[in-house]
Amino acid sequence: MQRALWIGGPPGVGKSTVADRLARRHGLRLYSADTRTWIHRDRALAAGIEAAERWEALPPTERGNGSPDELLAMSLHVERGPMVVDDVRALPPTPLVVAEGSTMPASLVPVDRALWLLPTQELQRRRLEKRGLPLPARALYELLSATIAAEAAEARVPVLSVDGSLGIEETVDQVEHHFAWFLAAESGTATLKERRELLREANLDIVAQLRGFFARPWADGSAEQVERSFACECGDPACTARIESTVGVAAAGPVFGPGHER
């Protein structure tokens, strides 16, 4: 727990991009809770959690139906928090971990090592409208955002309000400033080889997530030809490139942006 920085907040607020860029700048290990979705669901099923069993049994076309409370319960928001903590504790002791996700458990993380990114109501409204989500999904997002904000307030976790006025680099700078004391001890300690290994690890986490989805008995098709965005593995601290690649190609790796192979 003392070897991690924790970034929480609702979906779509920019956590993943901020954490990715912070990790790449400083040569840190990235942990994204989304990449453990199917591992966590399997743990919940093994533990006999009724909401997990109910979701798994529903036809995929019906999983978006139901009340916001029912959908939130089946998202396993509460149950996944301790799983996230267990995951991070199991990671190697070095380097420092940047852990991000909507399931970050505000009540279980050290507040001096945490920062929650919370959108303003106006920004959330604009983003939900832009996505064109059906009403049940939109209601779930609104409830999840309110739940995460309430959890942060109760745990007294520091909050960065996101209103859309700052670009991503400016937001990363603010998060970097918040964690400056911890980052100062890490910057410059990772070799190029270590940076590349950490980027490979993060990309393979995405590969595992997608393969985990297509391994479900109700999923059709194969993950190998699915395209996703992967981090360039050049290891340059200034590199922010992300490469569209199929899962199969990214798994074979390494993934490089044009001209970044050296």
Predicted regions and their residues:
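Hydrophobic anchor at the beta1->P-loop junction of P-loop NTPases
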Residues: 7
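The conserved Walker
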Residues: 11
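Conserved lysine of the Walker
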Residues: 15
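Hydrophobic positions on the alpha1 helix immediately C-terminal to the Walker A/P-loop
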Residues: 18
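Short beta-strand-centered segment that lines the nucleotide-binding/catalytic pocket of NTP-utilizing
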Residues: 26-44
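ATP-dependent small-molecule kinase phosphotransfer cores
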Residues: 39-96, 210, 214, 224
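A glycine- and Lys/Arg-enriched "phosphate-lid" helix/loop adjacent to the NTP-binding pocket
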Residues: 109-157
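NTP-dependent small-molecule kinase module
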Residues: 147-201
